[in-house]
Amino acid sequence: MPNYINYPSWLHPEVIQGIPITWYSLSYILIILISYKFIWYQIQSDNVDIKKEDYEIFMFSLVLGAILGGRLASTLVYDKSGIYYSNPWLILLPFDQHWNFTGFRGMAIHGGFLGAIIAPLITINTNLKNTNVQKYFLKLTDYGSIAFSSGYILGRLANFANAELYGRVMKGGIIFPNAEPFDTNIPGVKEFASSVGLEISPHDLLINLPRIPSQLIEGFFEGPVTFLLLWFLFKKIKKYDGFIFGVYVMLYAFFRFFIEYLREPDKELGFIITYKPITSLSEFSFLNISMGQILSLTLMLSGLIWIIVTKKIADKKIKNNTNLAYKN
């Protein structure tokens, strides 16, 4: 009996085949809409005095920053073809170098985090200077982390629809059509294929093996699990503004770091730190570290620094208010 699952033949990157609207693009539109509505809902629920027009300017800068940061990280860090360095306009255009429409493909969330902070910071110190958006910026970062995590899984579902970002070989896994096939001469490949019910003829040089659906596992832990922790736990123990955002960044980085062990390293990058070269299908080392894990460790440290800094800001406000009350 076969011990694997075939990738659904009816699932394609396009919502409707022949029409250039992809699940990936649709997922981002839905995430933006969910975040927009959910942040505004929290603002109103907590009676935070922010004008709708100021909020919309803030959200525009946040979304723009997240997209720019995500695209820059994806194209300049993860892509090693050099095409984006020689044709930088392709970073922001939905076309390939031959001007064929491709849609926007590739976003790195680590860069998205950075852009989603830098762009609003610029905006609140220029267009929104001396507004309540500037006053409540740290509170808005908390709202944003809760809102974004609530819709995050949609992006990973789109990755699954693209049959990309799949995991490592596993019995009972899914055979992704776009997965890189294995050389049948690699030690352990023939034995593994036989163990899951895949036949290899003497003339087969390559074979596609079942893999962990790591994009779905990532989506579950970095999306719903993280959202529930933020909403039902950390929101209740929050003592100052900015705390939840810092916790969110650390939670995301924590889950991402460990789930990366299940994920196939990026083909062009491989392992950035290789303690033990992989020479057979069964070999594995916790000390082989991918780019995603390095960036996640950096992100985790950034989240911790954010929590420390925002705590100091909160303590300073309390001290100033106490001194002011004492003087009065």
From Swiss-Prot:
Belongs to the Lgt family. GO terms for cellular component: plasma membrane. HAMAP family: Lgt. Keywords: Cell inner membrane, Cell membrane, Membrane, Transferase, Transmembrane, Transmembrane helix. NCBIfam families: lgt. Pathway: Protein modification; lipoprotein biosynthesis (diacylglyceryl transfer). It is an enzyme of class 2 (transferase). The keyword Transferase applies. The keyword Cell membrane applies. This is Phosphatidylglycerol--prolipoprotein diacylglyceryl transferase. It is a multi-pass membrane protein. GO terms for molecular function: phosphatidylglycerol-prolipoprotein diacylglyceryl transferase activity. Catalyzes the transfer of the diacylglyceryl group from phosphatidylglycerol to the sulfhydryl group of the N-terminal cysteine of a prolipoprotein, the first step in the formation of mature lipoproteins. A 1,2-diacyl-sn-glycero-3-phospho-(1'-sn-glycerol) binds at residue 156. It holds the Pfam family LGT. The chain crosses the membrane at residues 15-35, 57-77, 106-126, 242-262, 289-309. It comes from Borreliella burgdorferi (strain ATCC 35210 / DSM 4680 / CIP 102532 / B31). Its EC number is 2.5.1.145. One of its GO terms (biological process) is lipoprotein biosynthetic process. Its main location: membrane. InterPro entries: Lgt. It is found in: Cell inner membrane.
